[in-house]
Amino acid sequence: ARHADFRVSHLIVTDYDRPCALLVSGGKRCFRASREGRQNMQDYADVVVKPPILFAGAVLLGCLLSWIVPLGPGLGSANTRALAAGGALALVGLALGALSVREFRRAGTSVIPGEPSTVLLESGPYRYTRNPIYIAFVILYFGLAIMLTSAWMLLLLIPVLIILERGVVEREEAYLQAKFGEAYRKYQARVPRWL
């Protein structure tokens, strides 16, 4: 049972007799999940918290703590250099995040944790790191902490990174290993988790 699905920017070739079918998009490779991977598991990564909620919560908590129990110069007391440096970092984080999300859209898969991953991305920023969106969140968060002069936000980054690593990334990787099998293990061997 082989069929081709023509779309504006990519061609999907599906061969259910093989463990993995190939998606070719603009010369970039992605792998479809095997039939066994789709049938034998819940089809999403069971993360403890969605990363946007984790980072937004840390920003709000950091600002609240900075207001109630000030550390350092105080919330919103950044000078021009701090605003420029923090703003530049925030823009870098936003740009990296946008490039990363664009790869999901090009491949036709969901970027939202808790929804099925239909392809293994290996193009764009995913050639250099397995988690460019989370790196983008960290850069954006760090930039905001500098702009807001919130020492609490910087301190909260430590538990945020632990929760991100243990409660999100490790669970997503277990899901992707189960779903994409050998293709994901080869990707893990070739591309670092972070940088």
Predicted features, each with a name:
Residues N131:
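Extended, alpha-helix-rich binding/interface surfaces that flank or overlap catalytic cores
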Residues L11, L22-L23:
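Leucine-biased recognition of intrinsically disordered, low-complexity hydrophobic segments
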Residues R2-V13:
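Extreme N-terminal basic, low-complexity initiation segments
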Residues G26-G27, G37:
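Residue-identity detector for glycine
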Residues S34-S123, I135-L195:
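Membrane-anchoring alpha-helices and their flanking helix-loop junctions
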